[in-house]
C-alpha cells in the first residue's frame, strides 16, 4: 500500500531535470534541435521539449556553461557544481573528461574571485 502511494513521488524524484538532459546531450555531442526536441524529451518521460531546447541552446555556449551565477550567491554556486556532478555521473566514461574539466574551471573561477 505504501509503495502505491509513493510510486508517483519516487518516479518524479528519479526523473532527470531538463537542465541535466540538456547538458548530457551537449557533452555526448547529440544536438537538441527544434526538430528533435520533443522526441528527446519523451525519451526522458517529459511531455514537451520546448524548455529542454532552451536549456540546450543556453548550455551550448561555453561562456554560459562556465559562468559564475550573477548575482552571485554561495547557494547558486553550489547548485551549479551539483548540476555538473550529477551530469558527470550520467555520462559514459569516454565523454566525462570535458565536463570534469569545465567543472574544475568553474571551481577555479570561484576560488580566484574571493567570494
List each language-model region with its residue ranges.
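Helical anchoring/docking segments at protein termini
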Residues: 39, 54-58, 71-75
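Accessory, usually C-terminal, subdomains that scaffold auxiliary metal cofactors
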Residues: 62-81
Amino acid at each position: 500500500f505504501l509503495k502505491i502511494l509513493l510510486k508517483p513521488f519516487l518516479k518524479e524524484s528519479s526523473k532527470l531535470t531538463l537542465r541535466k538532459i540538456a547538458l548530457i546531450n551537449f557533452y555526448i555531442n547529440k544536438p537538441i534541435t527544434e526538430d528533435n526536441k520533443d522526441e528527446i524529451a519523451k525519451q526522458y518521460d517529459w511531455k514537451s521539449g520546448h524548455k529542454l531546447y532552451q536549456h540546450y541552446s543556453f548550455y551550448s555556449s561555453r561562456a554560459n556553461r562556465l559562468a559564475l551565477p550573477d548575482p552571485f550567491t554561495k547557494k547558486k554556486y553550489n547548485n551549479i557544481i551539483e548540476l555538473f556532478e550529477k551530469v558527470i555521473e550520467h555520462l559514459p566514461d569516454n565523454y566525462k573528461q570535458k565536463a570534469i574539466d569545465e567543472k574544475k574551471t568553474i571551481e577555479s573561477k570561484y576560488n580566484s574571485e574571493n567570494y
